[in-house]
Amino acid sequence: MSKFNFKTLNAEQDDAWAAMLQHDITFLTGPAGSSKTFMATAFAIDQILRKRPNEDGFEWIVMTRPTVDAGERLGFLPGNFEAKVSPYLQPIVDTIDKLVEKNSKEMSIIKASMRIRPLAYMRGLTFDNSVAILDEAQNVTREQMKLWLSRIGKGTKMIVCGDDSQTDLRESCLIQTAQLLRGMKGFAHVRMSENAIVRHEIIKPMMDRLSKL
């Protein structure tokens, strides 16, 4: 029996969890600190740890996010692909460290299941039996969004996390994509509002004021 026992903190987290459980593709959108990435990561951990040996289930946590962010380009960063992308995925890694006991059997299972896949090099890949998380999706292009969503394979759930109010692109396709997919079988979109913010209590009033910038 796994020691991992995640509990949601509010009604919006309940909605997000139910959506991810019941649908193949889930968009989680909302302001900074509203637990989008936290919920996606907790769900991935839960699903991986539920799998029993010789049973069907999720085997991999696939993680990615756009690496053209705040002016930085992947090709000019040092190291191999994984080394280049890893810093961008630190929020997901931090959440895993918070939720799973260090040096535990569960942590070993999660670490073995983690796969970092640069968004720029997705072509030709298919993700089977995976919980696949695209973080900071407000910064993906239309072509990247289509490429990512079309990687879904058998037994896979895709979770797209993003805040359309914080984008490094002139035109974000995040909400437009969610609107186009609305009503499609297997798709869900949950918007996490300011009420779901789980970071410091100052974030909500601060972001309200900074929205005027």
Positions of PLM-derived features:
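Conserved helicase motor core of SF1/SF2 NTP-dependent helicases
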Residues: 2-134, 138-213
